[in-house]
C-alpha cells in the first residue's frame, strides 16, 4: 500500500496542488498553459500504484480542463512513450530526448482546447510548427462540441 501512497502523493496530489494554485492566476491574466506528463504503462502489476496515480492525474486533468475549455488557459496531458530512463529501462525503444517535441507541443497549441491526450512519439522528428499543426488537427479535446 505504501507504493500507492507515495505514487499518489507525487503523481496526483502534487500536480493537483500546483494546478489549483496557478490556474486562478492564469484565468485572471487570461492566459496559461499546463502540460502534465502521464504514462501508458498497463498490465504491469508491479507498477500498479504508479499506473493508478497517473490514471487519476489524467482524470483530474480532463476535469479541470473542462472548466477552462474555450479560454486561453489550456491544460493538456502528454505521454512521452517508452523511453530509456530508470523507469523505462535500457531496452526501451526511445531516447528520452525523442519525446521533447511531443511534450512541449502542449504548451504551444493555440486553439483553446483543453484535455488533450498527446502521445509524444507521434511528434518525433517534427518541427515545433508541424507538431502544433498536427496536435490541433489530430488530437481533439474530449469535451462535447458546442454547436
Residue locations for each model-derived region?
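Residue(s) in the substrate-gating loop at a strand-loop-helix junction
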Residues: 39
Amino acid at each position: 500500500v505504501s507504493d500507492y501512497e507515495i505514487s499518489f502523493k507525487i503523481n496526483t496530489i502534487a500536480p493537483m496542488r500546483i494546478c489549483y494554485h496557478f490556474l486562478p492566476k492564469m484565468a485572471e491574466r487570461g492566459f496559461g498553459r499546463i502540460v502534465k506528463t502521464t504514462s501508458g504503462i498497463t498490465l504491469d502489476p508491479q507498477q500498479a500504484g504508479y499506473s493508478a496515480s497517473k490514471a487519476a492525474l489524467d482524470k483530474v486533468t480532463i476535469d479541470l480542463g473542462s472548466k477552462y475549455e474555450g479560454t486561453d488557459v489550456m491544460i493538456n496531458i502528454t505521454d512521452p512513450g517508452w523511453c530509456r530512463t530508470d523507469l523505462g529501462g535500457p531496452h526501451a525503444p526511445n531516447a528520452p530526448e525523442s519525446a521533447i517535441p511531443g511534450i512541449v507541443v502542449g504548451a504551444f497549441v493555440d486553439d483553446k482546447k483543453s484535455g488533450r491526450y498527446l502521445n509524444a512519439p507521434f511528434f518525433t522528428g517534427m518541427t515545433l510548427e508541424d507538431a502544433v499543426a498536427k496536435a490541433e488537427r489530430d488530437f481533439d479535446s474530449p469535451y462535447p462540441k458546442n454547436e
